[in-house]
Design a protein with these regions (language model features):
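Active-site nucleophile loop of the alpha/beta-hydrolase fold
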Residues: 58, 136-144
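Conserved hydrolase catalytic core segment
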Residues: 124-134
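Gly/Ala-rich beta-loop-alpha elbow adjacent to hydrolase catalytic centers
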Residues: 113-118, 122
Length: 147
């Protein structure tokens, strides 16, 4: 399955899959994860499900994915608490754009996934809105202060 890059907002999202998909898989990704995305999508493609996968890049991981501000836990960089802005970007730009460009049903099953802090973001986002059919949180950062 080949990828295409689609500019959504100011972010180059990597998109895999087909129009009219039954599932829309969204994954917040850092630069360090992009090398393994092709393998991840190939594994998902082994299923019989028709899906569209979007790797949505995150520039400042600690700020964009943290649900609230918190001091540094390791190192010197704290957490900015901008997860609400990231969730708004997904719901107001990414999802509507993908639905339109790939002719997805209004009832498409949306699954939000992520690893580490992106996994925590996925868990948190599922508590904020009733939009996601499922969440995949791989090794989520549940150590996050206040979680």
């Amino acid at each position: 399955m080949t990828a295409q890059t689609m500019q959504i907002g100011n972010r180059p999202c990597r998109i895999y899959g087909e129009a009219h998909a039954e599932y829309l898989l969204l994954q917040m990704t850092g630069e360090h994860e992009l090398q393994s995305i092709d393998h991840e999508v190939a594994a998902i493609a082994q299923s019989s499900r028709n899906f569209l996968f979007a790797a949505v890049p995150v520039e400042n991981w600690n700020d964009a994915l943290s649900p609230w501000e918190a001091p540094a836990v390791w190192g010197k960089q704290g957490f900015g608490g901008n997860a609400a802005d990231t969730l708004r970007f997904l719901t107001e730009q990414v999802i509507p754009t993908l639905k339109q460009q790939f002719d997805l049903s209004e009832n498409v099953k949306i699954i939000l996934g992520g690893y580490s802090l992106a996994g925590l973001f996925a868990l948190w986002a599922s508590t904020q809105i009733n939009l996601f059919y499922g969440v995949a949180a791989a090794s989520p950062s549940v150590w996050f202060p206040g979680w």
